[in-house]
Amino acid sequence: MLPNTELHTTEFSKTRKFTRQSFKQIEQLTASLANDRVARHKFLFNNSLPLISDYSGEDSNGHQLQATIKIPDEITNPKEYDPSDYPLAEDESFFKQGHKYDYLVTFRAGSLTNTYEPKTKMYKLHAALDRLMHVKQRKSRFADLWRELCAVIASLDVWYQTTNYPLRTYVKFLFHKGDEFPFYESPSQDKIVFNDKSVASILPTFVYTCCQVGTAIMSGILTHVESIAAMNHFLHCAKDSYIDEKLKVKGIGRSWYQEALHNVGQVTVPVWSQFNEIIGHRTKNTSEPHFVSATFTALRAKRAELLYSEFNDYINRALRLSKTQNDVANYYAACRAMTNDGTFLATLTELSLDAAVFPRIEQRLVTRPAVLMSNARHESLRQKYTDGVGSIAQSYLSSFTDEVARRVNGIHHDEAWLNFLTTSSPGRKLTEIEKLEVGGDVAAWSNSRIVMQAVFAREYRTPERIFKSLKAPIKLVERQQSDRRQRAISGLDNDRLFLSFMPYTIGKQIYDLNDNAAQGKQAGNAFDIGEMLYWTSQRNVLLSSIDVAGMDASVTTNTKDIYNTFVLDVASKCTVPRFGPYYAKNMEVFEVGKRQSQVKYVNAAWQACALEAANSQTSTSYESEIFGQVKNAEGTYPSGRADTSTHHTVLLQGLVRGNELKRASDGKNSCLATIKILGDDIMEIFQGSQDDTHHHAVSNANVLNESGFATTAELSQNSIVLLQQLVVNGTFWGFADRISLWTREDTKDIGRLNLAMMELNALLDDLLFRVRRPEGLKMLGFFCGAICLRRFTLSVDNNLYDSTYNSLSKYMTLIKYDKNPDFDSTLMSLILPLTWLFMPRGGEYPAYPFERRDGTFTEDESMFTARGAYKRRLLYDISNIREMIQQNSLALDDELLHEYGFTGASLLIDLNILDLIDEVKKEDISPVKVSELATSLEQLGKLGEREKSRRAASDLKVRGHALSNDIVYGYGLQEKIQKSAMATKETTVQSKRISLRLHEVIATKTRDYRIPTTPADALHLYEFEGEEVVMDLLPHAKHTSYSNLAYNMSFGSDGWFAFALLGGLDRSAILLRLDVASIRGNYHKFSYDDPVFKQGYKIYKSDATSLDDFFIAISAGPKEQGILLRAFAYYSLYGNVEYHYVLSPRQLFFLSDNPVSAERLVRIPPSYYVSTQCRALYNIFSYLHILRSITSHEGKRLKMVLHAGLIAYVRGTSSSAILPEADTV
């Protein structure tokens, strides 16, 4: 018997609370959908469901809208495959120039047959198209596409308490083709298999489309009636070629919001200071200047020409009905959801080559510089521009050369190269002979740059390797993104990458010398858009957002020479003695104007840059299974270089800032207040009179055009875009459609469910301030976890199978498989208890209210709820903390927790199955081979520094401060190589050992398992009582009540209320964290749980005299030491009591991340202050409680109530140095 799949009628659907009964009901229903294909089919296509065709309801802004479901005949009765859709050139050497379609055309899936002679071009083409339809459409992120769709539909059913809504009708019309699903994912074959050959080729992608539209509905971006507009538009695009049409119309479908803001006339907006603080609000006129508004007519005509008529009608209606800035924001978010289905756009590399990498000559060619000095190989050593755009850029960049050279001289470049190498793919594979030479283990590890460099370390100082790499073709690697066409990047091998490393090192020094570059310190929160918030709230500004179209393809040899000129100028002033195969030496050079050659001392950096500049423009090739080796024409800038982004950033700022200097020399004033550049994205802010700002903006655009770039500058007085972040009049309009919850570039098996949940949590954090309804997002994430991330399958030795099953089945649901006598092991699936989603080291997801034994409920946890060990407090909350305080009890309610499944979830976490896999794999890695490889690399870099680091770490260990190898500089190379070795898949032999060891652990743990407790659990025993004192909201509550600061911060919302209570970001704390993060090269990812900080802090608190050895061990220079010492001192303000929690910057975004912000909102009895650390600890309690319970907060003062055991614990630990882990990741 299948369980009742009527999720929408459950008690949980009505109350959004878990009673003991309703929890079991949801657990069983979601487990059924996770594990039973028949149940999924019945749930999605229940014959009793009503089918809607006409629907009326409210749109995003509350206006009535009517819509009719329309599924084109081209989708339900697709055409037969037509070979002429992918025409070949006459000589069959490639696709015909200007072919119509770059992506998968819509046709009947079964009509793509391959009847051509094997080995012919047509046979190979059809085999490739078959892979495009079956393999490249498979993009699932968390589970197979039908489970993901079930998660979305389940959340909609429960949220709206009905199955009667349009998206379900689309699902049934599109995918219900009998008792079987029309297609399914086959992980073993790594492809989609069609059961029904009559369906459209593109139909699997529409499962993801439905998931994305459902996500937009759940998160409040689309209403049900607007979902019809979205689905109708997507289906209209798919009549011919879905992705081609989507790419064609996406821009024009979103380009109307400036006109809508212009029409609004006046808005009240927040005013920001330059220190990321709201200091007031003002009325602003949103009317755009004539040179902007003059473009609106042409845009309207283009929309009418290109867009599906119903979608264009929706936009015209939005223009007509938008009366406020909030109206425009809501309609704009809806239109973005209607033009991006969140899928990663994939096609054959051969079809996308022209659009991705074919050289483009835009506007005009750049003149070349005059060569002033060259070497015997006729490579330029020094060059200069006398006129043109090159001269403009050089006039600005030349002012940095002396300081950049000084900084470059202070770098050990061989060591920097070793640190630059990662565990990513090395751009080539070992030949069979090379594999035999290095041995099987090392050959298996060599799929990483660091190991490949170690294998060929003996050749590092030989120039021949560089010349050899220059002759080898550069391989293309395809990359897919959401909402952008497929790209092709250059898969450079280590030697070719090395060639671009010195120009990268030189170029990136500029980042620290001016503030033009947006590279570097990205905090992940509103700090990143601080300048945009400030300038869009100012008067008399013109905001320019520039995107350079196809920049890599537009950088010609001549354009690249602008950067080469700067790099060679810097290199000529360096004194670098050695770098790879280059040694500083006297060389024969030729100078312009001198008849005889001269001998000149040329340092290593100069030699390296000269060779790179002379050989930086070679063609790329792609090994096509259809056409053989396809060579791209000369001229495209290889996008996989070390300095790709740096080149673009430095070049563009040279052109823009150089133009500013030229204008000054021509007697024209500068209106350029600031610029920010990252790669091919440019933000310019002009301030002054309307005419002056416009003339300067046009002048800059002209310079970029003269440099060979096609630029589209969006000018506005209201809005600015940089790095896909849109800010409008001091408010953030985040692009929710850019976050793909359900798809990824490459589908991969979910090995670690806890890591998959971390990924889900991170994606939801990204979405949180981009959506209007975080509560809907919470439910969506819950059902994703419950249906997509509950099943874990492992291989169990046949001899241990039954005993393993018997031990675990007491605590969780298991699925047994029939044993095959031909194999030693059999699969067993563990169905995780639903409560695993809410556990620390489990899912760490915000919990819905759980019923306690006395009938009361725990808090409904908001999406701002902290994660990490703090989630352990839920166990005590369910066990009733208030009662524990009253009865002075410390015991968990084991019986109730077991009934909910927390005991089984805790057991699963304690078993640590996934770490067992790593443990077994680690045992098989030869430490001798790892050491040999690391030693071969150490000879190339700072060998003495590494030995010194290891000695310092050894001395610390003797004094009781053992450091982990991953932070000791002297073991860094070993750790990288070890990581590469661990990335290989476990063998059958290893699986058997894992099974045996797991059986031993299970037998030990499951005899009488109870959730373990620790003395530190006392820190969770606090409560808050409401008092009748209404708390004042902070002043910016009023300033943000007119225009929504973000989509989830409308007046009266949880986001707005949390901001009104706690305030905004602590700038000084963020800057400090960014400084510390910069030491690790992990800007926005730094956490106080970072091992460098964590282990250093312990030494700082307990044995400060050992800090010098600590700094030597981690190889921290004077600057890094100062940063860490400041961070240690700042962090010590939190006291010595350990209380772990994790909040990500994106999860808070605008909200304060400083626990002190909660101090004014809570009354703490004086008797609780039993040590100097109490104030900081109690602020953390208060802060985390307000974030967690913001939905039920009534705006009144709270009183803290503590358990006697907590006070005793704080009193007893206040003098010992325990790391306070208020983690911010």
Swiss-Prot record:
UniProt xrefs under Gene3D superfamilies: RNA-directed RNA polymerase lambda-3
Catalytic activity: RNA(n) + a ribonucleoside 5'-triphosphate = RNA(n+1) + diphosphate
InterPro entries for the chain: RdRP_C, RdRP_N, RNA-dir_pol_reovirus
One Pfam family this sequence matches: CPV_RdRP_pol_dom
RdRp catalytic domain span: 497-727
Keywords carried by this UniProt record: Hydrolase, Nucleotide-binding, Nucleotidyltransferase, RNA-directed RNA polymerase, Transferase, Viral RNA replication
Signal peptide range: none
Enzyme class: transferase
EC nos: 2.7.7.48
GO biological process terms held by the UniProt record: viral genome replication
PROSITE patterns: RDRP_DSRNA_REO
Assembly and binders: Interacts with VP6.
Function according to Swiss-Prot or TrEMBL: RNA-directed RNA polymerase that is involved in transcription and genome replication. Following infection, it catalyzes the synthesis of fully conservative plus strands. After core assembly, which consists in recruitment of one capped plus-strand for each genomic segments and polymerase complexes, the polymerase switches mode and catalyzes the synthesis of complementary minus-strands.
Family: Belongs to the reoviridae RNA-directed RNA polymerase family.
Name listed for the protein in its UniProt record: RNA-directed RNA polymerase VP2
